[in-house]
Design a protein with these regions (language model features):
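SIR2/sirtuin-family catalytic core signature
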Residues: 18, 37, 41-51, 70-73, ...
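Active-site glycine-rich loop that binds ribose-phosphate moieties when present
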Residues: 108-125
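Structural motif
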Residues: 55, 93-95, 137-138
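Gly/serine-rich nucleotide phosphate-binding loop at the start of the catalytic core
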Residues: 1-47, 52-55, 63, 199
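A charged nuclease-like catalytic/ligand-binding cleft shared by nucleic-acid processing domains
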Residues: 13-26, 32, 91-110
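Conserved subregion of the PPM/PP2C metallophosphatase catalytic domain
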Residues: 64-68
Length: 220
């Protein structure tokens, strides 16, 4: 959601006293039929790649639906309790901006996003721990999002202050087209920009990229 939608959500909460009806409407209208998810090559690739953790800022349930239709176990994490209860050995789907099943977890309004800038919520702590110990691949994030830029800067700053920056696991951002400004920003934070060799729409480029990763992993 962009800044305009965040302000609209804030206005709605101020006028209505809560987000319940809006949340229910969004949940209904963003729901994608299971058969459509099952037909999605992109979602099949995400399941096949067996990532230890998937962080999403989306509010839809497409990732969970993909794991269910392909018979793969997962653990959804949107709050501290779910984090503690999450099983080992399965993909953790971390709903970074909350889940419609838990209104208190939602990061939807202007105030929610401003409050989140402190980056001290349980999900922020989990992400920082994962980012310190693992290779991170960012897909579909906009560098125009100040929350994302602050988060990336914070990870870089942590490594710079640690005295062990040369031991930092590599991190990557995949984008469908190159942008020299964003590439320079990302390089400053120690993140490599990946782009397709040929022009394609964003979904096709991402599907081809993930298919290539899967092929390389399966290669004897």
């Amino acid at each position: 959601m962009n800044d305009g939608y965040q302000m609209l959500a804030e206005f709605y909460r101020l006028k209505q006293g809560g987000l319940g009806p809006l949340r229910s409407w969004l949940d209904r209208n963003w729901k994608v039929a299971a058969d459509r998810v099952a037909e999605s090559q992109l979602h099949k690739l995400i399941v096949d790649l067996n990532f230890p953790a998937l962080y999403t800022t989306n509010y839809d349930r497409n990732l969970e639906a993909a794991f269910e239709v392909h018979g793969k176990a997962y653990a959804k994490i949107a709050n501290a309790k779910q984090m503690a209860d999450a099983a080992d050995g399965v993909t953790h789907i971390v709903r970074y901006h909350g889940d419609f099943d838990d209104d208190a977890s939602l990061v939807l309004t202007e105030t929610d996003f401003l409050d989140r800038l402190s980056f001290d919520s349980p999900l922020d702590i989990k992400f920082r721990a994962d980012a310190l110990a693992r290779t991170i691949l960012f897909i579909g994030y906009s560098m125009s999002d100040p929350n994302i830029r602050l988060l990336l800067h914070g990870i870089w700053q942590t490594w710079e202050r640690s005295g062990y920056r040369d031991h930092r696991p590599r991190s990557f951002v995949f984008m469908a087209s190159s942008n020299p400004v964003q590439e320079a920003m990302l390089a400053r934070w120690g993140i490599t920009l990946l782009t397709p060799e040929s022009e394609a729409c964003a979904d096709d480029a991402l599907t081809a990229f993930l298919a290539d990763i899967r092929a390389r992993i399966r290669r004897p």
